[in-house]
Amino acid sequence: MDGSDSLLKSVDVSKLDNGSTISFRAREDGFLESISSSSGKLVDMVLDSTSKECLPKFSFQNKLDFYFLFSDRVLQLQKERKVLVLIHCESLQSFDSFFAQKLKYADLISSDNVHEIFLPDSNAANIRYHWEWSPPSGKLLEYECKNYSCIAVYSTEDCTLERISKFSYYTVSRCGDSMDDTFFSESQRVTSPLTTSQTVQTQPPQSPEAKTELSLINTKTVIFPENYEDGPSFRSMLHELEQKSSLMKYYCKKIMKRIVQLSDAYDASQVAVMKLSETLSEASNSTSMNMDILLDSYLTKAMDIHATFIQKLNYDLINLLYEPFHNIYSSFIKPIDDRRLEFDEQSKSFYGSLSRYLSAKKDKKGGDSKFFQKEKTFALQRYDYYCFMQDLHDGSIINDINGIFLQYFHRQYDHIALFSNLMNSVLPNLQQLNLKLEKTKWSTTRRDKGREMHRSQVIQTSGRPKSMAPPSPSPISPSFPLHEIQSPMPNRRMAASADDISQTSNFTTEIKGKCISNGGSASPDKIFKEGLLLVFGATELGTDLAMVSKAAWHKHWIVVENGSLWEYANWKDSVKSNVSSISLKHASADKVRKQGRRFCFEVVTPKLKRLYQATSAEEMDSWIEAICEAAKISSFQLSRVATPLSASVRRPSKVFPLFSTSFETTPISRKLSGSGIKKAFSRKGSWNLQQFFRSDNSGTMHMEQLERYHASANIFIQMLRKTDVSNSVCADCGSVKDVTWCSINIPVVLCIECSGIHRSLGTHISKTRSLLLDSLSQQSKVLLCKIGNAAVNRVYEKGLSNPSLKPKPEHNAQVKLAFAQKKYVEHAFIDFAGVDADATLLEGLEQNKISKILLGLAAKPNFEENGVVFLKAVTRDTSKLHLLELLFMNGLLLPDSEQLSEHVSPDMQSYLSQKQFTKYLKE
C-alpha cells in the first residue's frame, strides 16, 4: 500500500526488560522502521534465516505492550463493510497461509492467531489501539521465538485479506533464570592448576589478628601476579577470572530480579494496607462493627505510618539500590563476554603478526618498527584487560557494589528507626483502647451469665416455655356508647348482644391476647392484635382437616387493625413478603368444631371464609374476641371511611421494619342482598367452595376455573417440551428450573430469571409472557411449538465461537443481562453476511423455512413498504397463520381496507379485522 493510503501511522513497543520504549514508523512499502528509543541506545537486531530480514530484538519479562496509532480513515471501514484485524504467527508459513486463501469471517475470527480490532467512535484525527503480547502459557522461562505480525483489512463481501503494514520481531524472555545453580561445578570454582594450594602456601602465614579481620573482597582463590607478562600462569589466571566473571554475571542478574520482586511486593503491600483501611472504614459505617473509635484513635494513623514506611522503603530500593546496581552491571559486568572476545581477537592478531615477523628472511624496511609498535599495543591491551579483570574481582567495581548496598541498608535502618518512633507516639491511644475493651468484655460477661441463667430456668421449667405461652389477659373498654349498637348478625359470636345493649356505657369486656385500645372516638383502629397463625390453603377446602397434609397449612403473620385482617406471607423474608387483606366489616369469627386439628377457628365475611389455627386454646379465644370486637366497630361506623393502611396503619410491632406499608385492599365488587349475607354466614354454607370464592361482574374467576386453567397450562407446557426437547431448558442460560416463561415475538422459552431480563430490554425487543399465568392465543401456542429454542439459537447464536461466553444458571443477573443485550439487541452473534432482510424474509415465508424467517426479522425488514407483500405470502395458506402472528408481533401492521381486499380473501379479512392492529400513517 502507498504511504498516503496507509491507515497505520506508527507503533510503540513498551514493557521491555530495560524499561525503555521503542517507536516504529510505517513506511510507504508497508513495513516498519525504527525511529527512536527512550533509552537512547540502538535497537538490537537479529538476522532471520527464513525471511532474510533483520528483526528487532525485544527482551521482555512477562509481556509486551504494542500501541498502534491509526488515522481517522479506519472509521470508514465499517461503512464499507470491512473489518480491521491483527494477525500474529510464530512461523512465516502460517503467516502466509492467511493471505493464500479465502476465509469466512467466522473461521477467520475463531483463529487464535487473529485478533479483531475494535476502535472507539471518535472524531480525533489519530486513534490509538492497545494490544498486549504474551508468550504461550507454560513457556515464559527461557522463551525465544520469531514473531510475524501485520495489520490487515478483511472484506466481508469477497472474503479477502489486504495487508496494511507488516512488522516482524524477535522476542527473548528475561523473566526466568538462564542458568541453573549447578551450571558451574566445584572444579570450576577453585583455583586453576597454575595457582594451586602449593602456590598459596608460599604466602606468609597469617597472624591470629589477621585471621579475625573481615574483608569485603574475597581473593582466596585468585593470586594477582605482579608481572602481567603473557604466559601460562597469566592465561590460567585470566581463565579462572573469566569463569568467575560468568558466575558473577549470573548472580548479578538474579540479584536484580529479586530486587524487582521485592519492589513489587512492597507495592502490593502498600495497596493492601490502604485497601484494608478503607474496608474497615466501610464495614464500620455499613454494619454493626463499631470500629470508629479504633479507626480514629489508632488504626488510621498507624496504617498511614505503615503505608508511608513501605513507600519510602520501595523508593529507596529502586533509586538507591536497583538503579545504581543496574548501571554498574550494564557498564562493567554485562560486557564481560565482549571484552573477552575482544582480547582473544587482539591476542590472535598479535601472535599472527609475530609468526609473520619471524618467518621473514631479512629485515625489511620498517618491518621491525611496525612489529615493535604492534607488540607495544598488545602489551597495553593485555594490561588494560588485566586491570579490568582485577577491578572486577578485587578493585573499584566490587567496592562500588558494596558501597551501594551499604548506603541502602543505612537508609533502611533510618526508616525503621523513624517508623518505630512514630509508632511509639500512637502507643498510648492503643493502650487506652485496650482498657475500654476490657470494660466491654466485663459487661459482655455479665450478659452471658444472665443468658445462661435464663436458659437454665427454661430447661428446668416444666410445661410450655414462656415464649410460646399466650400473653396474660388485658382488659379493653370500648370507647363508644354501646347502647347505640344493634347487632345485625344473630347466631354468631359478636362482641355485642341484646343483653350488652342494656348495660351502661362503662361496660368492659376482656379480650385475651395482645390487644390495644386507645381513648378517643369510636374507630376501628382502636383494636390492634398481631401474632403467628396457621392459615388453611384455599385449594384444599371442602375436606376433612384431619386428612389434609401439612403442606396445606401455611404460617402467616396476622395483624388485626383498622377494621381489616392483614395476612403477611413470607414474613421472614422482607424482600419476598406478600400482603393480603380481609375487610372485617360484617364479619364474624367462631370455633370450628368436629375437626381433627386443635385450636381452629373460622372468619366469615360476605366475600369469603377463612380458616385459621392458633397455638393454644387461650390464643384462639383471644383472636376470636379481637376479630369480633374489630368487626363490631367496623360494622357500625358505615358513615366513616376507613383511613387507608398505606397512610396510617401501624406496622406489625414484632416484624418491624420488614414489611412495606403499601398494601392492596380487598375489593367488594358488588352489593350483597340480605339473603346473600345470610347464605354466606349460615353453618350449612361453611367451607363450600362455590360460596367461598364467588365470581362477580369484575371478572373474578371461580376456584374451579382457576384450577382448570392451571391444569390446561401445565398440559401445554408438557406438550411444548415433548415437541422439542430444547424447550425444557432456558434458551439463554440453560436453566431447568421454573422454565415457564416465553417471549412470543422471538419466540423462545425462558426461565423466570431470564424472563425478567427480557422484560428489562423493553417490549420492542422481547414481549414476555407467562405460560402459567398469562392467556396465550392459539396461534402463539402453535408458534412456540413449531419453532422452539433450538431453531432460534441456531440463528441468534450462530456466531458464538466460544460456548463459555454463554451464561450458566448460577451466573448473576449482570452477566445474563449483558449476554441478552448482545444476543437480542446488538445481534452480535448473528451472521448477517450477504443478508437482504426483505428478500430473506419473503423467501422464508414462501418456502416455510423458519431459519430464514428469523434471520430476516432480525435484519429488520421494511414492513412499511413491503408489508402487503409479506401479508400476501402468508395469507395464501391458512396453515401459516402462526407465521402471520409472528409478523404481527415483530411490527407488521395491517394496510387499509382497500389494499387488504385486493390481496386477502373475505374470510381472511374477517379474521384479520379481529386483530385490531393500527393502520399505516402515510405522510
From Swiss-Prot:
GO-annotated cellular components: cell division site; cell tip; cytosol
Molecular function per GO = GTPase activator activity; lipid binding; zinc ion binding
Gene3D superfamilies, sorted: Arf GTPase activating protein, Arfaptin homology (AH) domain/BAR domain, Pleckstrin-homology domain (PH domain)/Phosphotyrosine-binding domain (PTB)
Q: Name one GO biological process term.
A: retrograde transport, endosome to Golgi
Q: Which PROSITE patterns does the UniProt entry name for this protein?
A: ARFGAP (PS50115), PH_DOMAIN (PS50003)
Which residue numbers delimit the Arf-GAP domain?
714-837
Per the record, residues carrying Phosphoserine are S207
Bias-annotated ranges (Basic and acidic residues) = 444-455
What are the boundaries of the C4-type zinc fingers?
Answer: 730-754
A Pfam family assignment: PH
Keywords assigned by UniProt, alphabetized: Cytoplasm, GTPase activation, Metal-binding, Phosphoprotein, Zinc, Zinc-finger
UniProt-listed InterPro entries = ACAP1/2/3-like, AH/BAR_dom_sf, ARFGAP/RecO, ArfGAP_dom, ArfGAP_dom_sf, BAR_dom, PH-like_dom_sf, PH_domain
- Region called Disordered, residue ranges: 444-476
Q: Which domain of life is it from?
A: Eukaryota
PH domain location is 526-632
The record's subcellular locations are: Cytoplasm; Cell tip
Coiled-coil stretches: none
Q: What does this protein do?
A: GTPase-activating protein for the ADP ribosylation factor family.
Protein name as it appears in the record = Probable ribosylation factor GTPase-activating protein cnt6
